[in-house]
């Protein structure tokens, strides 16, 4: 585990490099993951084992970039996860013909707890992931965000991501227990 940034507000952005690093922060990550995705516009319900699986799977993928924004108290207030798009088969299928999957890094997860938003933390997690991507292997970054073009969309656009015009329907369990689909929009950036 390596500290990439120590912010003035007491938050450190750390890079998890091994499954053992993930074990140290597992419980804190699970709590943050469940809380963040339970909020609009996603309103998704994840059980603890599902959230834990996100972290474990990411750390097993070669060339992953797994970042947590943490406090000394052990609280995880945000996260950013990236890995080769080839590790996410459904996404790789959607973008074939748009970007070369073997040269594309997928920014799979970005989340910041509600009380820690509007402090530049989301942008900083994106910037740190961009800095960690191996540009010898990957020429493009791809992500998907809510098609509602909310604050997250605007943040990515200001950072230079381009709207691809490609959408994907994502099915998920909602907070009310139902399963529904919503539309996600792909954004990309050349490195």
Regions found by a protein language model. Name each.
Residues 42-71, 76, 81, 87:
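Active-site rim helix/loop that mediates acceptor-substrate recognition in acyltransferases
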Residues 117, 129, 142-153, 169-174:
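Conserved beta-strand-loop-alpha-helix junction that forms the acyl-donor binding cleft
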Residues 81-109, 168-178:
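Conserved acyl-donor/pantetheine-binding loop and adjacent beta-alpha core of acyl/acetyltransferases
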Residues 112, 118-133, 154-158:
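Conserved acetyl-CoA-binding loop-helix of GNAT-fold acetyltransferases
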Residues 64, 181-187:
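Short hydrophobic/aromatic beta-strand or adjacent loop that forms the aromatic wall/cage
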Residues 67, 78-80, 105, 110, ...:
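Conserved GNAT-family N-acetyltransferase fold
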Residues 157-166:
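Conserved acetyl-CoA-binding loop of GNAT-fold acetyltransferases
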Residues 1-27, 31, 35:
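Conserved N-terminal entry element of GNAT/NAT acetyltransferase domains
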